[in-house]
From Swiss-Prot:
This is Late expression factor 2. Disulfide bonds: none annotated. Pfam families: Baculo_LEF-2. GO terms for biological process: viral genome replication; viral transcription. It comes from Anticarsia gemmatalis nuclear polyhedrosis virus.
Amino acid sequence: MASTTVWNPAAGVGSLKNSEKYLIDPDDFVGVLALSPCTVFKQGLFVEMSGLRLRALLTATKPAEPKRAVLHRSKRNVCLKACADGSINLAKALSSLRMPLCMVKIMTELSNASAPRGGMYRKRFEFTCYLGNVVSCTKCKSACLIDALLHFYKMDPKCVGEVMHLLIKAEDVYKPSNCVKMKAVNKLCPKAGTCKGKNPICNF
């Protein structure tokens, strides 16, 4: 029986296996994938299809869209491929980063939680946005970051959707809240004044 995998758009068409089953977000294929009242949604969010059909969708001709210039920040080159299957935990893989105390605190709390949900949306948002702004991988073209976060969030369907939206679908990766808000509003900064800059992404 073929295995089922949540499709990571950052992985590219070359990673597809024709015999495998993939769960895709139909929002990624607007104008290409036709849905009907009879379409079956897995976990209420995804459509299942074979790798062969997904390959055809990905290689279908799409209308060209104008590209706007984006200012890219420098990032730390870290490969997180081993985190995608749990061979190495995310905290260990990120040990080379000088993460601010707020992100260390959030990562620890999310890692120790039995589930990534339950009043932790703000923590997930800040942590995902932080990594999206400071980490990249030239080898995997950052696909490993997506897979590592999906594993870190235990493949929870809602969390999968959040990661895909924040790191792939959004035109620009959102920045985490500034340090003042992290301390005064979100209550996620354990000790003010220990970081440089006005945003957690200034520290990595």
